Swiss-Prot record:
InterPro entries recorded: GPCR_Rhodpsn_7TM (IPR017452), TAS2R (IPR007960)
Protein name: Taste receptor type 2 member 116
Note: Several bitter taste receptors are expressed in a single taste receptor cell.
Native species: Rattus norvegicus
GO biological process, one term: detection of chemical stimulus involved in sensory perception of bitter taste
Name of encoding gene: Tas2r116
Cytoplasmic side: 24-55, 116-128, 205-236, 283-324
Length: 324
């Protein structure tokens, strides 16, 4: 049973990494090529590019760590390397979460409309808001690193892979506060994203109430902008919720009997956010959507060409054998 779970999780993890790297790669490549062509890049494209690159590195870290733990279980995951991997994962994960949150805040400030002095002040100073978000992220990241490296440690169960490719339970000495810290510090950007979504929804509701005022064209364009951003944020919030829920479950995982199965499920759920979220961003952006369709069409044509090259020798050999 352990071997089946291990193989299933390996397949799921590999598929998630492939899907995530393809989506994040499209976002990064399109924006970098656009920067090289125009010699400038917008604020939202800067956020998306940094988000895509951080997620590519994060996904590769997870995949490489998993495969190394499979082939070199004893030599790879020593106590020192375990601490380094946790710190690097925490840093990349926090970067990914806060960049996704910054994107939500940016969209909210650009689309929403409130007759509030504070909101108007923030709306015309979007770059300063993004800078303030970055400073807050750096402070929280430093505090997070300090907490997970606290000197007080306990022995908790963690799954390791032995040479026979089966999963065994092994006691590993890590920070007692590590799972709680990840949940706590992961909740902060999630809460910010949720608040921006609710405020944007409230802005759309207020706009709908005032639809009988103003011109028809302006009314339609504002409504469409609200709905388009809300669609992106709804999908983002759902994926964010799955990610945060996986952190909460991991905290309480020791209370359940089938801990191995729950551990694999939560691990797969955590990777789903950086893997699937880029496709939500692509679908909500016309430029990225067009580039992704072009990339998929190119891959389809390449597949057809390879298929034809394989079939041609077979047809030729059959024709030659039939000749007298």
């Amino acid at each position: 049973m352990n071997g089946v779970l291990y193989i299933t999780f390996t397949v799921i993890l590999s598929v998630e990494v492939i899907i995530g790297n393809f989506g994040n790669g499209i976002i990064a490549l399109v924006n970098i090529m656009d920067l090289a062509k125009r010699r400038k890049i917008s604020s939202v494209d800067q956020i998306l590019t940094a988000l895509a690159i951080s997620r590519i590195v994060l996904l590769w870290l997870v995949l490489v760590s998993w495969w190394l733990s499979m082939f070199y279980p004893g030599q790879w995951m020593t106590e020192g390397i375990d601490v380094i991997v946790h710190n690097v994962w925490t840093t990349l994960n926090q970067i990914s979460l806060w960049l996704a949150t910054s994107f939500s805040v940016f969209c909210f400030l650009k689309v929403a409309n409130f007759s509030n002095t504070i909101f108007f002040y923030l709306k015309i100073r979007v770059k300063k808001v993004m800078t303030g978000t970055l400073i807050m992220f750096l402070l929280l990241l430093g505090l997070n690193i300090i907490v997970i490296n606290a000197s007080k440690t306990i022995l908790i169960p963690e799954y390791k892979v032995n040479m026979s490719n089966s999963l065994n339970l092994k006691n590993t000495q890590i920070s007692m506060l590590f799972p709680f810290a990840n949940t706590l510090f992961g909740f902060i950007p999630f809460a910010v994203s949720l608040v921006t979504f609710l405020l944007l929804f409230f802005s759309l509701w207020k706009h709908q109430r005032k639809m009988h005022h103003g011109a028809q064209g302006c009314r339609d364009s504002s409504t469409k902008a609200h709905i388009r951003v809300l669609q992106t944020l709804i999908a983002s919030i759902l994926l964010y919720f799955v990610f945060f829920l996986s952190l909460v479950v991991k905290v309480w995982i020791s209370l359940f009997l089938e801990r191995m199965l729950l551990l694999l499920i939560t691990q797969a759920a955590k990777i789903a956010f950086p893997s699937l979220h880029p496709w939500v961003l692509i679908l909500g952006n016309a430029k990225l959507r067009k580039a992704s369709l072009s990339a998929l069409q190119w891959l389809r044509c390449r597949h057809k060409d390879e298929h034809r090259r394989v079939q041609r020798p077979e047809v030729h050999s059959c024709g030659s054998s039939c000749m007298p």
